[in-house]
């Protein structure tokens, strides 16, 4: 609520995108059509991603209370580190979208490369940071020794996974969406999560009763599995286009 009120004040004060009841009630049909055309794949991608993560929790829940406890703390630590990645992704979308909307396609393409390289560096830094603090966090966590062992391993896996996630999040959610190329994010989530991580995770946990460490690696590989496809699609430069009217 506080964030909503603050956003309303800033928007109307600086006239960035003034909110008017007339514009809310009487919408432009062409704009509404474009809005749903470009945002529906984003919503679907988020839905696919969210449900998959719920199923990850179901898989780990089958592995026992120690695995659940370790995953709970690992997820909190991961969310804290991800703030940096999400910030870069949001900034990338604004910068690239502004350039594309202004018709500066060559400059947008150049900046896209720079931002992608920046995301690689941030992924390496945040990933290594998470790996370094893994022993400290696992020792300080109020849980059983078995759960602490799981937690330390999970944080290391998450650190390695963040290196790929940084690039994927920046490119998919930032650069691609700025150019209206949001369908690939949905396809990537379906392929990496629903055709790989989720089914293999369920088979490993429920059919073969695999150890926690192996199951966790399987359900954490979705970002790395998706990375080559993201790079190939990025180099096609389909996202370098002006979608404004």
Regions found by a protein language model. Name each.
Residues 1-7, 86-89, 158-178, 184-196, ...:
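Short runs within selected transmembrane alpha-helices of multi-pass transporters and secretion channels
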Residues 1-40, 96-161, 204-245:
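Short alpha-helical transmembrane segments in multi-pass integral membrane proteins
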Residues 2-6, 24-55, 59, 80-84, ...:
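Hydrophobic faces of transmembrane alpha-helices in multi-pass small-molecule transporters and flippases
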Residues 5, 51, 55, 79, ...:
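Transmembrane alpha-helix boundary/anchor motif
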Residues 42, 46, 54, 58, ...:
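Transmembrane alpha-helix boundary and packing residues in multipass membrane permease domains
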Residues 47-80, 98-99, 136-145, 207:
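Helix-terminus/linker motif at the lipid-water interface of multi-pass membrane proteins
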Residues 66-67, 182-183, 211-212:
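Membrane-helix interface segments
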Residues 70-134, 166-185:
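Small-residue-rich hydrophobic transmembrane alpha-helices
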